[in-house]
Amino acid sequence: MLIKVKTLTGKEIELDIEPNDRVERIKEKVEEKEGIPPPQQRLIFAGKQMNDDKTAADYKVLGGSVLHLVLALRGGF
C-alpha cells in the first residue's frame, strides 16, 4: 500500500509498505530515499510517536495515510 511521509519542510515522500511492516522497516525505506539514518527519525501518526517494534497495522495505517517525520538530532556541547 502507498503511504506518504511528510517532513517538516513540507516535502512528501511516497513509500510502498505492507501492513505487517514494522515501523523500523518504514524508517529504513525513508533512509533509502532520503539518506536519514533511522536512529535520527521520529515518525508521528495520529498525534502519536510510532514505536520501532510495532507494525503499520498496529497503528491502523492505511493506504493514503500520511505520517509525519521529525528529526531527532542529538545536540552536544
Curated annotation (Swiss-Prot):
Location in chain, cross-link Glycyl lysine isopeptide (Gly-Lys) (interchain with K-? in acceptor proteins): G76
Record note on disruption phenotype: Worms either arrest during embryonic development, or show vulval eversion at the L4 stage and burst at the vulva during the L4-to-adult molt. Those who survive to the adult stage display severe defects in terminal differentiation of seam cells, vulva and male tail.
Organism: Caenorhabditis elegans
Similarity comment: family membership: Belongs to the ubiquitin family.
Subunit comment: Interacts with dcn-1. Covalently attached to cullins. May interact with atx-3.
Entry comment on modification after translation: Cleavage of precursor form is necessary for function.
Protein name: Ubiquitin-like protein NEDD8
Function: Ubiquitin-like protein which plays an important role in cell cycle control and embryogenesis. Covalent attachment to its substrates requires prior activation by the E1 complex uba-3-ula-1 and linkage to the E2 enzyme ubc-12. Attachment of ned-8 to cullins activates their associated E3 ubiquitin ligase activity, and thus promotes polyubiquitination and proteasomal degradation of cyclins and other regulatory proteins.
Lineage, opening ranks: Eukaryota, Metazoa, Ecdysozoa, Nematoda, Chromadorea
GO annotation, cellular component aspect: cytoplasm; nucleus
Superkingdom, natural source: Eukaryota
Pro-piece positions: 77
UniProt-annotated site: Interaction with uba-3, residues: L8, I44
Compartmental location: Nucleus; Cytoplasm
Start and end residues of each stretch annotated as Interaction with uba-3: 70-72
GO biological process: modification-dependent protein catabolic process; negative regulation of apoptotic process; negative regulation of DNA damage response, signal transduction by p53 class mediator; negative regulation of gene expression; positive regulation of apoptotic process; protein neddylation; regulation of proteolysis
GO molecular function: protein tag activity; ubiquitin protein ligase binding
Keywords, alphabetical: Cytoplasm, Developmental protein, Isopeptide bond, Nucleus, Ubl conjugation pathway
InterPro entries according to UniProt: Nedd8-like, Ubiquitin-like_dom, Ubiquitin-like_domsf, Ubiquitin_CS, Ubiquitin_dom, Ubiquitin_ubiquitin-like
Presence of the UniProt keyword Cytoplasm in the record: yes
